[in-house]
């Protein structure tokens, strides 16, 4: 129950006019940016990072929590009304959601997404309150070899398990790791890959990488293939649900939340798998199977809840171990670092006020989102009509501003462009961007932990294998790597029964 | 997803360029690692070299595997999106114009200040993307760059240079 008292302290910290205002600004800005076509949650968070720069950490993170949930909600609005999801995690929501919108039930689709996000987000954040301290207790006992193993697992998970192509995911990861290598080696002070440019000695700021890959890369990619016809936007009224919609939605919300949270919380989870599972489950359990494929409300309620719950779940490894498993968590980690705060087991000891205020503001952001967005949905939908040349010009404008503001170095703008071109190339050739971002962020830490492990063993490679934790993780890694071979074994190749 | 018209004919050969990029990066990383002084100590038995060397080798191996994948007809699916029309070829002119305005911003931001360079960036990008309302574009650009300057540089203390307008703003 200690957690609950911490959480109450967190709530007590939020309830000041200025902090409430921060949460409100965050939710509004996050939704407004997230709803813009082509801007997913990760890009929203990266683009809006600069507005937190001048603030003290606590307020910055309250604002940030609002931006995060606002961006997620905005993304689902876009996918329901336009049917072309910006992020892979909203793909499933878009299927039935857009069909509902086309059938004249856009208001109900948005309502079940909004209320479902609220329910699932609240439940998952509550789960986070109880699970995170347990993970922290576990993580406190971990040594460098264990951390090294966990990071290896995270690398494999984001590059091999989550993507569609192993070789492309792995290549993306390696490029990210190389970018993370740039700068002065923290242990020996040797310059690596700096090409003699003094500004590169500190490495490339993660914010610059994230904004370059997400925002600039996306803007350039869209510019190269800009659809000249305007996209049809489905008009929407104020979202509401009838009694029957409620009856059909509440179970999918709860099931979605239950599926999403655990997937988000494990390093190899992500949001794609639980949203697909939730969709499949709802399709099977529904009393209205005839509506699936024509706009079934369960098909929006479940996946959207799963998406939100997994987003909250992904904060568990991020806060407790310092391990980002989604692009948003990766950007968030970068934000923590820009305040000199190191997520990980010690975070809860060193910055209890900050962490618990952050968690409390997740609840608050969720609530504000619901209160604000139900009445404001028609206004957000209007943002979808923004002329595309202004939209993408604006993305480049804010991306430049944010990247320059990090260090006030014009060279960062050149790097931003180069990274944007890299992001362009990755989109052209179908490379996933998540492994790259995770590589940039975790690469230097993995090297540090690996070298620490070897320091303890005097350079013997056996030092990398610590205790039971790392044994277990290496066993999982071996399973992941060997899975394509194992799958062909007779026990896995039984003829499948039709589902 | 339907295949792009230009790609139906055969493999997406441009992917070999990506292999070359990965391989070259790998070689560059290894060379850079061999250039740095190899320092080891009891505190740090492996030094700064092994990690880049391992990454470089991994990049080379990945480049080869990728090339094999491409030769077998593998292709990555270009990213779709709300405003993306994959049936059109890459619009080089737009992309080059955007790159140009982007670099102009990088060059002008310190001498002229964010208000001017940012406005140039916005106006130019909108122009490159097909905006033909030049005056309206300029008004929006000016409003955005002034607005962000006052809100962020003056309001929040974010680093944005005033440039030649120092003292006026």
Where are these regions (language model features)?
Chain A
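Transmembrane alpha-helix interface/packing and boundary motifs in multi-pass membrane proteins
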Residues: 27-41, 70-83, 158-163, 258-267, ...
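A structural-propensity feature for long, helix-poor, extended segments
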Residues: 68-79, 86, 296-321, 325, ...
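Helix-loop-helix hairpins and the membrane-proximal interhelical loops
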Residues: 1-60, 133, 139-140, 191-296, ...
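Membrane-interface alpha-helices at helix entry/exit sites of multi-pass transporters
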Residues: 58-62, 99-116, 287-300, 327-330, ...
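Membrane-embedded alpha-helical modules
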Residues: 111-227, 338-489
């Amino acid at each position: 129950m200690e957690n609950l008292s911490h959480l109450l302290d967190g709530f007590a910290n939020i309830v000041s006019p200025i902090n409430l205002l921060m949460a409100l600004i965050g939710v509004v800005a996050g939704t407004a940016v997230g709803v813009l076509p082509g801007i997913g949650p990760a890009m929203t968070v990266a683009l809006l990072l600069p507005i937190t720069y001048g603030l003290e950490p606590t307020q910055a993170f309250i604002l940030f929590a609002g931006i995060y949930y606002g961006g997620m909600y905005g993304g689902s609005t876009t996918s329901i009304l336009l049917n072309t999801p910006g992020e892979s995690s909203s793909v499933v929501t878009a299927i039935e959601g857009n069909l509902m919108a086309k059938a004249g039930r856009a208001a109900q689709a948005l309502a079940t997404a909004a209320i479902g996000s609220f329910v699932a987000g609240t439940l998952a954040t509550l789960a986070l309150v109880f699970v995170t301290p347990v993970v922290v207790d576990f993580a406190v006992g971990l040594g460098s070899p264990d951390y090294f193993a966990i990071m290896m697992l995270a690398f494999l998970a984001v590059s091999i398990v989550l993507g569609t192509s192993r070789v492309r995911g792995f290549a993306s990861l390696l490029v990210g790791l190389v970018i993370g290598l740039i700068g002065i080696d923290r242990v020996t002070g040797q310059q690596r890959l700096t090409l003699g440019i003094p500004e590169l000695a500190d490495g490339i700021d993660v914010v610059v990488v994230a904004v370059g890959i997400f925002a600039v890369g996306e803007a350039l990619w869209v510019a190269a293939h800009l659809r000249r016809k305007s996209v049809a936007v489905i008009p929407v009224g104020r979202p509401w649900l009838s009694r029957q919609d409620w009856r059909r939605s509440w179970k999918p919300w709860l099931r979605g939340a239950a599926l999403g949270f655990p997937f988000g919380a494990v390093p190899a989870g992500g949001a794609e798998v639980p949203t697909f599972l939730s969709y499949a489950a709802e399709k099977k359990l529904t009393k209205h199977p005839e509506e699936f494929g024509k706009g079934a409300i369960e098909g929006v309620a479940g996946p959207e809840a799963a998406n939100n719950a997994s987003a909250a779940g992904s904060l568990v490894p991020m806060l407790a171990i310092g391990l980002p498993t989604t692009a948003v968590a990766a950007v968030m980690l970068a934000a923590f670092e820009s305040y000199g705060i190191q997520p990980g087991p010690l975070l809860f000891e060193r910055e209890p006020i900050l962490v618990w205020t952050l968690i409390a503001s997740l609840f608050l952001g969720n609530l504000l989102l619901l209160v604000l967005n139900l009445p404001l949905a028609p206004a957000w939908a209007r943002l979808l009509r923004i002329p595309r040349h202004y939209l993408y010009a604006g993305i480049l404008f804010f991306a430049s501003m944010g990247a320059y503001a990090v260090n006030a170095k014009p060279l960062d703008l050149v790097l931003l462009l180069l990274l944007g071109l890299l992001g362009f190339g990755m989109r052209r050739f179908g490379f996933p961007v998540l492994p790259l971002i995770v590589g940039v962020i975790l690469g230097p830490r993995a090297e540090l932990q690996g070298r620490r492990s070897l320091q303890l063993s005097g350079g013997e490679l056996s030092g990398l294998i610590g205790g039971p934790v790392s044994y277990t993780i290496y066993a999982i890694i071996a399973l992941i790597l060997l899975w394509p071979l194992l799958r062909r074994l007779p026990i896995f190749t039984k003829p499948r029964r039709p589902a | 997803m339907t295949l792009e018209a230009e790609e139906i004919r055969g493999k997406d050969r441009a992917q070999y360029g990506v292999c070359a990029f990965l391989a070259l990066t790998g070689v560059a990383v290894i060379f850079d690692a061999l250039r740095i002084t190899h320092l080891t100590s009891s505190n740090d038995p492996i030094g700064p070299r092994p990690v880049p060397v391992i990454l470089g080798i991994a990049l080379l191996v990945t480049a080869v595997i990728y090339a094999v994948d491409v030769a077998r007809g593998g292709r990555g699916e270009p990213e779709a999106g709300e405003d993306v029309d994959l049936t059109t070829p890459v619009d080089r002119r737009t992309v080059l114009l955007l790159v140009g305005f982007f670099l102009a911003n990088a060059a002008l931001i310190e001498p002229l200040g964010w208000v001017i360079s940012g406005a140039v960036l916005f106006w130019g990008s909108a122009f490159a993307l097909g905006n033909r309302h030049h005056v309206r574009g300029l008004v929006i650009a000016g409003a955005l760059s002034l607005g962000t300057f006052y809100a962020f540089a003056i309001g929040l203390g974010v680093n944005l240079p005033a440039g030649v307008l120092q003292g006026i703003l």
